[in-house]
Amino acid sequence: MLRKVRLTLGMLCLVFVTLLFVDFTGVLHAWLGWMAKIQFLPALLALNAGVILCLILLTLVAGRVYCSVICPLGVFQDVVARLGRGRKKMPYTYSKPKSWLRYGVLAVFVLAMLLGVHALVALLDPYAVYGRAAHSFLQPLWMWGNNLLASMAERMDSYAFYSVDVWLKSLPMLIVVAVMLVLVVVLAARNGRTYCNTICPVGTVLGFFSRFALFRITIDKEKCNGCTLCARNCKAACIDVKNHAIDGSRCVACMDCLDKCHKGAIGYRFAYGKKAEKAETPAPETADRTAGRREFLAGSLLLAGSVLKAQVAKKAEAIKMDGGLADIVDKKEPVRQTPIVPPGARGLRHLQSHCTACQLCVSACPNEVLRPSHSLDTFMQPYMSYERGYCRPECTRCSEVCPAGAILKIDKAEKSSIQIGHAVWVKDLCIPLTDKQECGNCARHCPVNAITMVPSDPSNPDSLKIPAVNEARCIGCGACENLCPARPLSAIYVEGHERHRVL
């Protein structure tokens, strides 16, 4: 019964978190946004003491329920482990705890947080690992499905669906995500929860508390006949049947062992005052797993990446011609001295110190402005660029979805008064000066009237007009940069502010 309850709740949590990352409309966040906010590391970085306290108390009462129910990467590993074992259900075997590795990784993780090595912190956070995988592989599939429905509906004169662009936001991040995903999948398919009990820093922290849990899975020595059914079904490899011991720090409370014991020797019981036993039996040799299944999983990931790349290339080729009459040159990103980060982030330093690079804000951005950074010091964290859109003053989506406090929640009025950067005019690229043609596109579309058109020749009021930027009024939304007709570089671009200002 407990196993069925755990499976049901775990699958619901996995589906809810996945829907958060694949949804591009923003509709689901109003209902499911709390799922991201109860994840351990985002809550810690957001200084959400209530959530952290509840998770620790839950662990002290019931063990590592967080790992078996709430953590999306943990539940995902259970799914992979089930598929990886196949119909023959290759047995698991007990292994000695690799405490030196677990606490070594945790020490490196804490040191990285203290020293500001944010890329390493983001790389190890289990919630962010799953979020990036869902964003990189599942959201494009979701969008392609939506585009197919939109195409079919349009033929029937229905516009219930609308097409969205599917494009590769960051190749370096995609490679990192694929490598991490393959690592997790291979470990889960071969040995269950190996990743959780050797690499995951959140699992190590909660494992320390779970040793003192009030309710734990224990073995009744009087009833146990040593059949090893429980150990052969333990994904955490923490049951030592020979010594009737269960390593409480590694048990993820999956409850799989409970239904396997026909003698009632193993159970989830009140264990206050009983120290969690540490088994010391040498690890038996692990049974070989089917190589073909591993190759299939790896091949599937490579195929998904190839399909995504092919679709992006096809889309890019399709938009290069304007009705077959003129070439359309894609905009290139200008070289900025300071990256632009979203309103609500307060500035580059605040975003760096709080962001887990989960990509939830990138998934939710409706204007295609946010994308993962390639820079080493902010790797995979979001930054803004305006080649495909601009940050509309009425949009506050990213601040609404961020679970880690990296982008603080703001309303529309607050956003209109936050200066994230200022526009810079490039004289040598401006069309009135290069092509001797009237333009003024930037001034017409500036939502805060920070750009005015002035004569290019002060002595001749009738000369072609060029833009003049009022930096004190500009909020850095990027409308001017995005809508500038100059190619491949815009004649006006936004330079970011290291620290945001309030106008």
Residue ranges and their predicted role:
Residues 1-244, 249-250, 256-503:
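Non-ligating segments of multi-cofactor redox enzymes
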